[in-house]
Amino acid sequence: AASLHKSYASELNVVGWAMGGTVTRMADWLRYIDGTGGAGFAVAALGGISSVDNDLQWVQDNLTPLGKIVLEKSKHSCMYKNLLEEAYKRFISDTYFQGGSAFFENSDAMYALNKYNLGADGSKVPSAPVFMFHARNDIVVPYAMAQGTARSWCQQGAQIRFTTYAGVEMGHTSAGIASLPDVLHF
């Protein structure tokens, strides 16, 4: 929302944004998370994007019977149920949709996913100040992704305050909780 504000809802008087644990490079993140304990996130992300983005419609069109079941269940389940049921599975595979094993080599797929990269398009830079936070030990979204986006946005003129939660106890969810006082103060 922060990167689309100028083109999507410019009439809103946004005075600041706060975000943390944010996926900023979709293809890289899908490659990273698929097959891990967080694979349920990949199911929800790819299912959601492919249902609304015509450039990824072929994912929906080429779902296997199992892929259709999994995506339909994910639409009606909370994220934690998706995480439990899809943990350590490789969703981006031929098991779930035809062409899945070659997904990351498909130039059309990469074009579509790269549209969701934050910080890459100079016309999509937050105009209001941004408070970004991320746990260095986040196993759901790699720290370097968020840090890279913050740097890119800063180089493009955005006002970014980036906070790192470095404790070993800090992960994807715990950093979100720990950041609440900073978010409210921001």
Predicted regions and their residues:
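A conserved short beta-strand
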Residues: 9-24
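Extracellular/periplasmic catalytic domains that process cell-envelope and extracellular macromolecules
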Residues: 11, 122-126
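Hydrophobic/aromatic beta-strand patches that form the interior of the parallel beta-sheet core
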Residues: 18, 131-133, 163
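Accessory cap/linker subdomain of secreted extracellular hydrolases
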Residues: 20-121
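C-terminal catalytic histidine-bearing segment of alpha/beta-hydrolase fold enzymes
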Residues: 31, 105, 110-113, 137, ...
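Short beta-strand/loop motif that positions the catalytic acidic residue
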Residues: 125-126, 130-138
